[in-house]
Regions:
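Short, solvent-exposed beta-strand/turn patches at coil↔beta or beta↔helix junctions
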Residues: 1-10, 30-35
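Structural recognition of beta-strand segments within beta-rich domains
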Residues: 16-17
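Periplasmic OmpA-like peptidoglycan-binding domain that tethers envelope proteins to the cell wall
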Residues: 28-95
Length: 95
């Protein structure tokens, strides 16, 4: 989404100013689908964010990717709104 790209652009700007910082991009999925499918989906989601940050000059060796699939929902509901909240990538400062 446009908002997601703007968030990543801001993160890239911050990371360029803080060149010693490394991050972990966590990929998440909603509850639908198998565990294996959602782990792969979460990984693709996190890798898409990584690729986007790299287009802004952030080195791949500063970015780790981790998928939680459907294991860590932010909304425990079982409806379209909850599912949309749970499909996400989260950036975590690693050091």
């Amino acid at each position: 989404t446009t908002a997601s790209r703007e968030t990543l652009r801001k993160q890239a700007a911050w990371l360029r100013k803080n060149s010693k910082v490394t991050i972990v991009l966590e990929g998440h999925a909603d509850e639908r689908g198998t565990r294996e499918y959602n782990l792969a989906l979460g990984e693709r989601r996190a890798n898409a964010a990584k690729d986007y940050l790299m287009t802004y000059g952030i080195s791949s060796d500063r970015i780790s990717v981790l998928s939680y699939g459907k294991e860590r929902p932010v909304d425990s509901g079982s409806n379209p709104l909850a599912w949309s909240k749970n499909r996400r990538s989260v950036t975590v400062k690693a050091n």
